[in-house]
């Protein structure tokens, strides 16, 4: 899905606002009996999405969301992470590799291991943000980047 590609899905009416980013968690037991589940569950679990447009203000009943759900257009949301400094070139296409570091106590751990990306994802570097060299506890030369996947 490119930036201009969208999918229609349903989201809780209290959450439905343009610009909202969320990680799709997947099917819940309550979804099995819902007649709208195919629309709700057409996203990839564990991935980050962004609401780009509210399709209508018609509220649909939902077994999970007490205030119902609204139809929205979503696109894949860019994800901020780190890459090796030598690969951090705006416009470059890369295969995502999480940093080879297991230091969970590091202040940059979540940047280096973001939710929503999977090892091997084909991504494009849309923006190079900053050097993480002075922040990396493992001594790896890294740059913070924004990736489109």
From Swiss-Prot:
It comes from the Archaea. Belongs to the UPF0179 family. This is UPF0179 protein MM_0589.
């Amino acid at each position: 899905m490119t930036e201009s590609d969208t999918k229609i899905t349903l989201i809780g009416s209290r959450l439905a606002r343009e610009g909202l980013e969320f990680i799709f968690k997947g099917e819940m037991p309550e979804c099995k009996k819902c007649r709208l589940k195919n629309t709700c569950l057409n996203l990839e679990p564990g991935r980050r999405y962004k609401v780009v447009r509210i399709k209508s203000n018609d509220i649909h009943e939902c077994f999970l969301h007490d205030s119902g759900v609204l139809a929205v257009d979503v696109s894949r949301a860019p994800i901020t992470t780190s890459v090796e400094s030598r690969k951090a070139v705006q416009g470059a296409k890369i295969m995502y590799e999480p940093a080879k570091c297991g230091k969970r106590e590091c202040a940059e751990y979540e940047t280096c291991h973001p939710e929503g990306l999977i090892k091997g994802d084909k991504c494009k570097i849309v923006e190079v943000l900053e050097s993480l060299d002075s922040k990396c506890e493992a001594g790896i030369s890294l740059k913070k980047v924004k990736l489109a996947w």
